[in-house]
Amino acid sequence: MYQVVKRDGTEVSLDLGKIKTAIIKAFEASGIAYEENVIDFIVLKVTADYASKVKDGKIAVEEIQDSVEKVLSESGYHDVAKSYILYRKNREKLRNIKSTIIDYKELVD
């Protein structure tokens, strides 16, 4: 099984369930109904899309997320892709805020 390289450099085993959950959340956020088998098919397409990006059994989490965006959009789920992109942007903002707070706290200490 592949290893996913997280943003902090740590590695975890690839969990397709996490990809599936993220896609379901994007569908729910966009208010679009979905079928379980469609979600499973999208997950399979995502794995096929990022397969060429795997190097030495490892792939960066951002590469997987890019593949999710691409597959959702190419599958005609543009609104779902937008929801997914917005979720990623919001998570990035939160990470940046946390990093800034930690940096500030270290400065003060």
What is each of the regions a protein language model found here?
Residues M1-D109:
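Extended catalytic cores of very large enzyme megasubunits
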